[in-house]
Amino acid sequence: MLAYCVQDATVVDVEKRRSPSKHYVYIINVTWSDSTSQTIYRRYSKFFDLQMQLLDKFPIEGGQKDPKQRIIPFLPGKILFRRSHIRDVAVKRLKPIDEYCRALVRLPPHISQCDEVFRFFEARPEDVNPPKEDYGSSKRKSVWLSSWAESPKKDVTGADTNAEPMILEQYVVVSNYKKQENSELSLQAGEVVDVIEKNESGWWFVSTSEEQGWVPATYLEAQNGTRDDSDINTSKTGEVSKRRKAHLRRLDRRWTLGGMVNRQHSREEKYVTVQPYTSQSKDEIGFEKGVTVEVIRKNLEGWWYIRYLGKEGWAPASYLKKAKDDLPTRKKNLAGPVEIIGNIMEISNLLNKKASGDKEAPAEGEGSEAPITKKEISLPILCNASNGSALAIPERTTSKLAQGSPAVARIAPQRAQISSPNLRTRPPPRRESSLGFQLPKPPEPPSVEVEYYTIAEFQSCISDGISFRGGQKAEVIDKNSGGWWYVQIGEKEGWAPASYIDKRKKPNLSRRTSTLTRPKVPPPAPPSKPKEAEENPVGACESQGSPLKVKYEEPEYDVPAFGFDSEPEMNEEPSGDRGSGDKHPAQPRRISPASSLQRAHFKVGESSEDVALEEETIYENEGFRPYTEDTLSARGSSGDSDSPGSSSLSLAVKNSPKSDSPKSSSLLKLKAEKNAQAELGKNQSNISFSSSVTISTTCSSSSSSSSLSKNNGDLKPRSASDAGIRDTPKVGTKKDPDVKAGLASCARAKPSVRPKPVLNRAESQSQEKMDISSLRRQLRPTGQLRGGLKGSRSEDSELPPQMASEGSRRGSADIIPLTATTPPCVPKKEWEGQGATYVTCSAYQKVQDSEISFPEGAEVHVLEKAESGWWYVRFGELEGWAPSHYLVAEENQQPDTASKEGDTGKSSQNEGKSDSLEKIEKRVQALNTVNQSKRATPPIPSKPPGGFGKTSGTVAVKMRNGVRQVAVRPQSVFVSPPPKDNNLSCALRRNESLTATDSLRGVRRNSSFSTARSAAAEAKGRLAERAASQGSESPLLPTQRKGIPVSPVRPKPIEKSQFIHNNLKDVYISIADYEGDEETAGFQEGVSMEVLEKNPNGWWYCQILDEVKPFKGWVPSNYLEKKN
């Protein structure tokens, strides 16, 4: 630290400098600790360098590790597309830079007194003696030129003293131009340039804010839209027009040898062609090399109007040179009256200067004259004044200028020895207006635009920062290398951490495919139009549509989006007609927020023989799951087809002794038969679940748990994701000739990556349903599996069944009993007791007009219940849709059948428990054997994947291959606070998989997830807890609400044990194009790929097979379809 330090720094003004180039400096008054004051001058680039040094030296204070800890002030960003040396830019930056200086010196001493800050504010020699604006002696003679005095009384010593700065003309670039030589400049449309020289070849020497070079004049236009100086018309007496002469007096004198040459010529000058030219359009004239042409009209755009062989037209000026006949006349008039010439080529011809390598024309002129060197050609030599007396430059001065002048080769593009051949021979493009030139069109903008959005909530703690919620659209104005972006969100602007902002392709409904650029926002399911099913002997669902060509749509992120339509999936007849299923339930009478997207229909791609012979596999989201010929496999069903957000899949057990169906039977047909029989047997038998590995997933802390009883002779559907399935009696185990339909093609809707559920402690004691997404979470290496299963079982048995049943009733929000009079054809979204009164467990603010807001503890009257998790309620005089997990039934309305159903099937439950547990355990061990063999996992994204936001609700959708799919509105995550302490839940963190078993803390709408993780030991025994809880008392009706909305935007997993490795070779085909990024693999439609790993979050690790060189990478599972 330095005792001598800066006390205050104030930026008072801006000042323009022209050395070494045009720029502005900021005048800063610096007050030091010894009360002395100094005035220093710093340009913006010095501020920028200081800022980068400070951010590198103090990364913590610069907010690179944690943006909230940043204390180093922000600096205005660089000007990318405007010139930083114009005054309005400098003045606009004046106040921000003043605030930056003031804040910088007030930082803690270890920053404000560091060496970098001290050196920046320390006075330098140029601060003590600011440079004077002496344009005549400036080093950059290619930019600032001296104006020679017109008065004949001026002498050599007064030339520099009375010099005035030349005013350069500014032109606007009308179209983009990419340089083709090092001596040229690239131009951007709309850019303003200073024209230093206008050459008759059509190539102008211009200056931008950063560099100088040659550009075609046809790409430039005067700021007022005119081109007054473009034509060089000579009068009848041979004099240059007054307007042209005024311009030449300012510009062309720079590039002559300083001589005032009298140019007596006729109106039509004779030129000789130096190269052949072929006409490109009707108004041009072609010619051979060495022919003489007459120039009728000249201009500075490089195209002259000539006459050749009686025809008139345009020709490139760079292909012409002055005829030899005119040279002697010019040379005689060197000492004559003053006249201006417009081209350095004429002077070079006049002085008989030819390149030694140029053998086309012999040297001309008098032999007594010494040839002029390259360096001399660019020197401003003073020749004859108007009175004829020579103004000679001393020899010492001439040699000094020759050494230091930068104006050499690129000055005269037609000089072969001092310019690139291309500039001498290549004509510039013609202009459209009078010359017939069509300017090149700028490139088309990209067809897919990128938009930015916030991925989590951020509260700014700095003055010029901006606070925002997750899921908001942001417009990025400036990107800082320090990790902060200047963004606009709504009407507000400010700096935001780049790690909280992600990009995606702008939704465009006209595009066929929907390919989001990041894996954190999975693409939506491609919907298709339903049509009438066709009769199929192999078996297709008669009541549902056949596959059509899919039509892809972009997701609508601001509304609740679900990958299905609101039509209930279960189509069945009342008692008796088990196979037809033609009757469609009525639609709800009000539009639910859940209905936004159609579902896609796909064709079941595997025959029953393939299914029977293929070993079972467990898939998530996309997986086509072959079913084995056993009945105990159905015991993994959660039976929760009505609860929103239900996403469960049964784990099949092979070769069960209770399977009545022969191996040759069509399992798909059997499943369709069970769908039709679901309602018939739901009140005829009390069924208990006997599988010891059951997992119920729910996102709601207030969800209820229910158990299904199963007798020895009963059957259950193989997946609870088949909406409307109930436990069916054994009568459906044999094939019915009336039921020849397999799974509907529409049941294979392409899913969105569904959220991982959060386990509820209350359900762990009574829930007896199986969910593969939860089962995956419990899979661990083989050595740990058996002990974990048995240990958790004994651990779970310590809790009495009464507690589980009681907690289940407390957490339930919509348990309404079904009686035997309930017709099977009643839609699932409408239940008995719809007029029940419920109490709100938390306040809710509506997001859409169709919703309703209510405070905490209010009584509402439920009018209608939709399976999406949204209930139509009346609160006071208002009616609207409300999320069901905000509602809790009153105590007197809880069913008292909860304790009656659990005892009926205990005996049969215990008989098959050990058998099914052993078989399922073997299957899990086999999977974990593969899990242990593959330890290498792809890199986990370093950026937070998008935060999780509260949505308006999730819904149970049509299943595809026995898997329930859910799509939600990616706004934020809302997890209601647990009403009881015995609820086991999870905390959501950034950069963590939702499978982490943590302690839940209530997170409000649009909040950021940074809660602390609690011990994960409580969740280790969850896999067997369900098995030990099967004797607990619980209601018969599986109406738990698992509808807590969870955003599909999620990270890739962290723990390797969460991967499910398939020991079979699974080949899938992509159903749409997908553009990958640094973390995921891109592919085209119709590409075959082998699935190597299936991750619960919906991303599969595949090997692409159709490419020339197969490669591996992560792909979204909802872009894949099982290969036939």
Swiss-Prot record:
All residue ranges annotated as the SH3 domain in the record: 166-225, 266-325, 447-506, 833-892, 1063-1124
Organism of this sequence: Mus musculus
Function, as annotated: Adapter protein involved in invadopodia and podosome formation, extracellular matrix degradation and invasiveness of some cancer cells. Binds matrix metalloproteinases (ADAMs), NADPH oxidases (NOXs) and phosphoinositides. Acts as an organizer protein that allows NOX1- or NOX3-dependent reactive oxygen species (ROS) generation and ROS localization. In association with ADAM12, mediates the neurotoxic effect of amyloid-beta peptide.
Domain PX: 4-128
PANTHER family on file: SH3 AND PX DOMAIN-CONTAINING PROTEIN 2A (PTHR15706:SF2), SH3 MULTIPLE DOMAIN (PTHR15706)
Region of interest: Disordered: 414-443, 504-672, 692-830, 886-952, 1020-1050
Biased composition (Polar residues): 926-935
Description of how the protein assembles with itself and partners: Interacts with ADAM12, ADAM15 and ADAM19. Interacts with NOXO1. Interacts (via SH3 domains) with NOXA1; the interaction is direct. Interacts (via N-terminus) with CYBA. Interacts with FASLG. Interacts (via PX domain) with RAB40B (GTP-bound); interaction promotes invadopodia-mediated extracellular matrix degradation.
Name of the featured protein: SH3 and PX domain-containing protein 2A
Keywords noted in UniProt: Cell junction, Cell projection, Coiled coil, Cytoplasm, Phosphoprotein, Repeat, SH3 domain
Null allele phenotype: Shows significant decrease in total cellular reactive oxygen species (ROS) and in podosome formation.
Phosphoserine: residues carrying this PTM: S405, S420, S546, S566, S592, S643, S764, S766, S812, S993, S1007, S1008, S1029
Gene Ontology annotations of biological process type: in utero embryonic development; osteoclast fusion; reactive oxygen species metabolic process; superoxide metabolic process
Record field: compositional bias (Low complexity): 633-669, 692-709
Domain notes: The PX domain is required for podosome localization because of its ability to bind phosphatidylinositol 3-phosphate (PtdIns(3)P) and phosphatidylinositol 3,4-bisphosphate (PtdIns(3,4)P2) and, to a lesser extent, phosphatidylinositol 4-phosphate (PtdIns(4)P), phosphatidylinositol 5-phosphate (PtdIns(5)P), and phosphatidylinositol 3,5-bisphosphate (PtdIns(3,5)P2). Binds to the third intramolecular SH3 domain. Required for interaction with RAB40B. The fifth SH3 domain mediates binding with ADAM12, ADAM15 and ADAM19.
Cell compartments where the protein resides: Cytoplasm; Cell projection, Podosome
